[in-house]
């Protein structure tokens, strides 16, 4: 039997805010449960399982564990796709930044981000991930993948800066080093991104920062990039402090 709640204390106290499955009879080490409650986006769920033997005289109670949902529906996104004002043939990589103010007593913060093709994103000058070439390749006119990051520890009280550099990847390939004729792909365009950060404060208030027309744009040291031929980087064009508060 499976027990689920959105607060750990509700699960421990078996309150009305938790719900449970019917007893699932099975001799396999797994079971499928069709919940009566639909999962909500951007929500942490706590769960616990109780298992009995066939006599129902002995039971095992699992520790309480949890999982978290992200953006379950396209309509959950409040951000919009953004890029700079250059066309697809302009080679320097787009740079985007957003300055915002965060209050004290932050409980948690999540960043949801997608790009076509790749993003290199920082918060207050520090990378939000150690991985590269995110997100994965798709047919961009049909489907786009996104990533979720816990950025709680990177937020500051006061001014914060979220910034991104966008790469062409397979979204904006150009001749003569394009593959599979992707320079003629139906989705080809200037790199772009969509993101949304939700900050939850300890008093229950929420703050959302999302991609929109208020973001600042520029170009910098990445004067050319290609998925196969690599990057051309001109350090003389680096903009000191672009991705940090106080710029």
Where are these regions (language model features)?
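Recognizes extended acidic, P/S/T-rich segments that occur
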Residues: 1-44, 50, 54-60, 77-81
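Surface-exposed beta-strand edges and flanking loops
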Residues: 4-6, 26, 35, 84, ...
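Short, solvent-exposed loop/edge segments of extracellular or virion-exposed proteins
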Residues: 80-88
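Accessory beta-strand-rich segments of carbohydrate-active enzymes
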Residues: 43-48, 53-55, 68-73, 87, ...
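Terminal edge beta-strands and adjacent linker/stalk segments
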Residues: 63-66
